[in-house]
Amino acid sequence: MINSPRVCIQVQSVYIEAQSSPDNERYVFAYTVTIRNLGRAPVQLLGRYWLITNGNGRETEVQGEGVVGVQPLIAPGEEYQYTSGAIIETPLGTMQGHYEMIDENGVPFSIDIPVFRLAVPTLIH
């Protein structure tokens, strides 16, 4: 979990075995992000940047507007949650990144997304 004076980010990931194909080096993961506005004014998420690293060290960068097609406005004390997915070629990897946001006055700021693991459960004891 990462906190700023205004925003808290939590991420949970899960392996999607039914959509994965280890024989074809395809490991599918879903991740759920919860963004909480701890401030006293609304904030809006405008964009995202992800760095996805597989177990071999291969990095993929993903960036774009909003998340899952929206640029949510998050009121004070409220949260926004969404689920998305990632596909990597190894049973273990990581994701990290940041969100580009604006405050109530339109002032931009960035919130780091903590590093989290993408892992097939049988690999973690």
Curated annotation (Swiss-Prot):
Q: Which Pfam family is an annotated match for this chain, by its short name?
A: DUF525
Matching entries from PROSITE patterns are given as:
APAG
Source domain of life is Bacteria
Occurrences of domain ApaG (ranges): 1-125
Q: GO BP, one example?
A: error-free translesion synthesis
Q: Which residues cross the membrane?
A: none
Name this protein carries in UniProt: Protein ApaG
